[in-house]
Amino acid sequence: MNSKKLNIGPKDIINSLPEALIYHILSFLSTKEAAITSLLSRKWRYFFAFVPNLDFDDPVRMQPDMGNQEETEIHTSFMDFVDRVLALRGNSHVNKFSLKCGNGVDGVGVTRWILNTLELSVSELDLSIASDTTYLFPSKVFVSKSLVRLRIEARNGLAFGSLVIDVGDVSLPKLKTLYLDSVELDYQIICLAKLLSGCHVLEELVMIDVVWNFWESCSASIPTLKRLTFFTEEGWNNPPPSVTFDNPALVYFEYTDTVALKYEKVNFDSLVEARLGLRVGYEESENPIQVPFGFPFPLIEYAMVGDATDLLMGIRNVQVLYLYASTVEVLTFRCKAIPIFNNLTRLTIESNTKVGWDSLPNLLKNCPNLKTLVFQGLLHKATDRCGDMCPCKPPENIHTCLSSSPVKVLEILKFGEINDKTELEQTKHFLELMPHLEQLNIYYDTSVDDNLVKVSKQLQEIPGVASAKCKVQVISDNLTLSVTLPSSSSI
């Protein structure tokens, strides 16, 4: 055999790779990284421009301390690079077009690139655009026949230049995912209604800081929707006047907002999991505060407003529920009645030292089939209205939500984050009162193994527990200890 035929160098191996494999390899790289491979050989010179996914990331965005002249030069180079790649590509189909650009990238160029990819029947647009002036998003995007996923983010948020969406006709027959982050909807509720009505197969909707608190009414009603995420920052405390959710196919609901004055309709017939981050709303009181004569400015009294009752009724068939600490407060002050959650099997409660557990006794009593209870931290505001939830209240005349609890698995996260002693007493309280408990997992936030040993020994010293068959584990990143509880029962 000719030995020369066996002498295949690395360059020959690279050149001999099938084009399909080359495109597959390049698909794991950003377009900028893929462009570097054009130096490997003449054959690879233009492959980078024909990968199915194009990913452009403005380098200035990652270097905020750059000088003005250098920043301008890099922006010009970046824009030339994007133009060159799209020109090389010609009419070749684009699967995904991802663009992240900061202030200084010409908005006219951004629009040109977006419209170019639309002509290439792009399936997915992922756009993160910062602008120090108002940028009007091209409305042609909303009549695309090819888009399956659309993500639009204003990188500056709502504090600086705005990314404004103004839709005319909307027809997105293939769109399944719509993600809007910090964008401004022109004509507000009309724009949102037109946009959603043109998405006939939409399955996932994410709205981040698309503030609707000042609209007369707000509605997210889509019959095909399966996942809905709505989030507004904590600073927006004006309650929305009226909110409607009519999503019979929804299985996942994540909602963080000031609780509305009224929930006109909440239809979640198929809901499986919900995460609620409701906040108490405030409005100026009708009763002004009397101030002394000559006081330099008027004092304004604010009153709690909002009603979460109908929203809670709408999610009552949920199986998995996560409540942020602010929601626990809303249940205390802005919910007339907590519904019965017959299907709920897993409940997670986030704790906060500023929020009491007043609403938890009624909540737990209304979860007759709850199997797993999770606490994200145990420290909370001490009050005299938390029943037997914690040892801060004298034992007489209290509601027995723990002693009648069906919970079998209790998980405590962030243990030891603030006050080990208080959290240990709370944990002992759970063990002494929960009769059906089979497993307690304590996730200790510590890097010191001796802390786990100490807590484990203290748990073993409990005089009696409500459930003799309960197994306890104390877990950290480095160690897991099993605790043997006393066999005698205190009940």
Swiss-Prot record:
Domain of life: Eukaryota
Pfam family, one: F-box
LRR repeats: 127-154, 156-182, 184-209, 325-351, 352-377, 419-444, 472-491
Record-linked InterPro entries: F-box-like_dom_sf (IPR036047), F-box_AtFBL13-like (IPR053781), F-box_dom (IPR001810), FBD (IPR006566), FBL60-like (IPR055294), LRR_dom_sf (IPR032675), LRR_FXL15/At3g58940/PEG3-like (IPR055411)
Keywords: Leucine-rich repeat, Repeat
Matches recorded under SMART domains: FBD (SM00579), FBOX (SM00256)
Classification via Gene3D superfamilies: 1.20.1280.50, Ribonuclease Inhibitor
All copies of domain F-box, residue ranges: 11-57
Protein name: Putative F-box/LRR-repeat protein At3g59230
Organism: Arabidopsis thaliana (Mouse-ear cress)
